[in-house]
Amino acid sequence: MILYIVRHGETDWNKMHKVQGQTDIPLNDYGRRLAEETAQGMKKIPVDLGFTSPLLRAKETAQIILAGRSVPLYDEERIQEISFGRYEGLYCGGEDRDPDSEAFNRFFNDTGNYIPPEDAETIPQLYERTGSFLREISSREDLADKNILVSTHGAAMTSLLNRIRGNLSVEHFWKDEVPPNCSVTMVEIKDGKAQILKEGMIFYKEKVKKWKTV
């Protein structure tokens, strides 16, 4: 089994440095362009089926990548983004950022001391649900020889890859930065064991990176 795990394309909230979490924000024009370029780059890669977070930005990314293919695409709640509760919608960029942004930014800068709001998820809860998804598909004999697209989000994708690496740490959750929009990581699952083959593949060109919405 080969997984192609992709982070969704850009949204307006990504561009504005607003906290998304499970708030359902669609792709913007640039995000769709990234997904289209990724689809073009992956056109020679066979894909048998896909799983997507039900959130619009991930689902639309998967639909664009799989356009023109007769491939089933299944909603999978376990790979949706972590919930940030009342922090969702916070503006975290610039001098006029929201007062709570400092507490939220510990999620990225000081993860071991990040305290989620009462109505949010913890990192261990994220590890558990994304791990449940990974364990289930790894054990399915009907998927053993399939190529599978998995369309998800920055933190959810990181939790999946951390589990594959054997890292379930909260303090060291972020190995690097958040995966870029529409970056693709290739994972092989064989005899129930997963390994990362290629990480952070980008299929869009440098000129597309610089393209901006009007």
Predicted regions and their residues:
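Glycine-rich phosphate-binding loop signature in dinucleotide/nucleotide-binding domains
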Residues: 44-46, 137-146
